[in-house]
Amino acid sequence: TGLMPIQVQAMTLAHHLANVSWAQEATADLTATTPRHHGGWRFCPHCLGASGGTWLLQWRLMWSFACLQHRCLLAEYCPRCGRRQRAPQPLNAAPPRPVHCAHPSPTTTGRNRSRCDADLADTPVITLEADHPTLLAQQVLVELLAADSGRFGLYAQHPTPVRDVLADIRILGRSILSATAGRHLDGLLP
């Protein structure tokens, strides 16, 4: 590739591995990075369209759910075929067009099916006000993932490793959803 190993590593999620892995030993296996991850990438249609199809690595992390630049929730599914994006493709598949869905068209059958090819830049997303709690939470997580420890809220007096803060957030989130069955979430989104 002509790149130094450190340059290649910077283009991967390896720098997040120690903070987001709950495996006993951190490995380069992406499934260890995001246990029970849904298998696709979320994405900001505005970012995809503006960049000509560049997928940001941060979208792969389960902690990414909103685009701070465009103040919207990230999309997860193709607007035409309804499938999650960036799933593994067959080895014999032709490279997909940037910004377009690479999944086989839902209206065709057979081995050499045409692609869905929907323009992902046209995917509708929920836009949020600049001070919406979801965007504030995403900003806190972005800053946390870039740090060596959590130093906000209850962690301000006792800096805590990022991995432990993320584990606390997961446990708290699961507990809230379990206790309320999600009943109180309706008023949080526009």
Language-model features: locations:
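C-terminal accessory regions
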Residues: 1-63, 68-190
